[in-house]
Design a protein with these regions (language model features):
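Structured, beta-strand-rich domain cores
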Residues: 123-127, 153
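Sec-dependent signal peptide recognition
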Residues: 2-9
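Terminal low-complexity "docking" segments
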Residues: 23-29, 69-118, 127
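Envelope-exposed proteins and targeting segments
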Residues: 110, 127-131, 136-140, 173-175
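Bacterial Sec signal peptide processing site at the extreme N-terminus
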Residues: 10-33
Length: 199
């Protein structure tokens, strides 16, 4: 596995509306969006210098994604919620080929963005997981804006996120993301992201 994986930095981004992006879909299906996003403001876009393009093997991407776990925050009086995998096996089956292709064509000013819609529970409520990734200083940054967030309407849950996968549907609630390899916390934030992430 690439040495780069040892330098993973991860953040949970919740409740942040984010700046104005242009999203260019690479894979655009009813239940999946993978694409490239950059600042709409060209002066901001040219200031971003991510380490793209880059080629990840599908095996490396699978090894990273399957080890990401989230423990979402609750209220002050709530007990700790159990850890959940960020991506289901079905999510990874859909995501990995598209991420593999998209990282290879991403430019330094781009973020790789994703959104996956699915149903869960007896009610088959529509949910979305969305966010983005970028490579900087030989470290992969992963931003999770929504994690299995219930979609209340087509406008909020589908159209808004297709326009900007960094758009969060919920209020700031914080959370922890873990990389299972060491089962230790790599990074924790609430309402923000790591490094030179979108602001």
């Amino acid at each position: 596995m690439k040495r780069i994986i040892a330098g993973i930095l991860i953040a949970l981004c919740v409740g942040c509306a984010g700046p104005v992006f242009v999203t260019r879909p690479i894979e655009d299906e009813p239940s999946l969006l993978v694409g490239l996003a950059s600042y709409n403001d060209q002066s901001k876009a040219t200031a971003i210098r991510h380490d793209h393009p880059v080629e990840w093997s599908k095996a490396d991407l699978h090894a990273i994604l399957k080890r990401l776990f989230i423990q979402e925050g609750g209220g002050l009086m709530d007990s700790a919620r159990p850890r959940q995998a960020v991506f289901s096996p079905e999510d990874m089956t859909s995501l990995i080929p598209s991420l593999h292709k998209t990282f290879k064509i991403a430019q330094p000013s781009d973020w790789i963005v994703f959104a996956i819609w699915g149903s869960s529970g007896k009610s088959q409520t529509l949910e979305v997981t969305s966010g983005g990734m970028f490579l900087e200083d030989q470290r992969l940054h992963i931003i999770v804006a929504n994690h299995r967030e219930r979609v209340s309407s087509a406008k909020d849950g589908i159209h808004a996120i297709r326009s900007n996968p960094f758009h969060s549907l919920s209020d700031v609630k914080g959370g922890l993301i873990f990389f299972q390899a060491a089962m230790s916390l790599i990074h924790e934030t609430a309402g923000s992201s790591v490094g030179s992430n979108p602001r």
